Amino acid sequence: MKANELKNATAAELEAKGTELTKELFNVKFQLHTGRLENTSKVSNLRKDIARVKTILREKRG
């Protein structure tokens, strides 16, 4: 996910995207702990995407 794509999104879209990514992170962590996750870098990528969304959302609000 590119930061440029996020900057063009509305605040409501960013909140929805953040919620979606948080749910996906929960599922990926669950797979990691049960031993079913093959691509472990997905956890860190999701965390970075969530941080990007939160940062841009904070910029729009502030």
From Swiss-Prot:
GO cellular component annotations, sorted alphabetically? Answer: cytosolic large ribosomal subunit
Q: Which organism is it from?
A: Citrifermentans bemidjiense (strain ATCC BAA-1014 / DSM 16622 / JCM 12645 / Bem) (Geobacter bemidjiensis)
**Which CDD domains does its entry note?**
Ribosomal_L29_HIP
Name the GO terms of the biological process aspect.
translation
Keywords of the record: Ribonucleoprotein, Ribosomal protein
Q: Which GO terms describe its molecular function?
A: structural constituent of ribosome
Q: Where are the transmembrane segments?
A: none
Annotated protein name in UniProt: Large ribosomal subunit protein uL29
Q: State the encoding gene.
A: rpmC
Out of the domains of life, which is the source? Bacteria
Mind telling me which Pfam families this protein's record contains?
Answer: Ribosomal_L29 (PF00831)
InterPro entries associated with the record: Ribosomal_protein_uL29, Ribosomal_uL29, Ribosomal_uL29_CS, Ribosomal_uL29_sf
Into which family does the record put it? Belongs to the universal ribosomal protein uL29 family.
